């Protein structure tokens, strides 16, 4: 939907199951509609409209048991390896 420098904004609306694999950059989800369970590493929690979810680069994550109307913005940003990789080299 939108790209500028290291910023990439998309709409994500999986149906049935969420086939995601870890990404190379940090990401933020902003839930627009729907509910479900978000798995972020070893943590599982319920989400709903308006929730903001952060996933560091390289972390296993997925949406489970989500409603048919689930839609979220996903924002990828920063360097490959995530901001934490940059912080380690400073």
Language-model-derived ranges and their functions:
Residues 1, 17-23, 40, 45, ...:
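Short histidine-centered beta-strand/loop micro-motifs
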Residues 1-20, 25-26, 77:
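A short glycine-rich, His/Asp/Glu-containing loop-to-beta-strand
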Residues 9-10, 38, 72:
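Short hydrophobic/aromatic-rich beta-strand segments that constitute the beta-sheet cores
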Residues 17-18, 53, 57-62:
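Histidine-centered metal-chelating micro-motifs
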Residues 23-38:
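Short, conserved beta-strand element in jelly-roll/cupin
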Residues 42-57:
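Short acidic-glycine-tyrosine-enriched beta hairpin
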Residues 58-83:
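Ligand-binding loop in jelly-roll beta-barrel domains
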């Amino acid at each position: 939907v939108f790209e500028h420098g290291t910023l990439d904004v998309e709409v994500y609306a999986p149906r049935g199951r969420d086939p995601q694999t870890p990404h190379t950059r940090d990401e933020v989800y902003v839930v627009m509609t729907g509910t479900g369970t978000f798995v972020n590493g070893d943590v599982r929690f319920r989400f709903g409209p308006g929730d903001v979810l952060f996933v560091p680069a390289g972390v296993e994550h997925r949406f489970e048991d989500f409603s048919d109307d689930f839609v979220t913005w996903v924002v990828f940003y920063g360097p490959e390896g995530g901001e934490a990789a940059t912080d380690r080299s400073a």
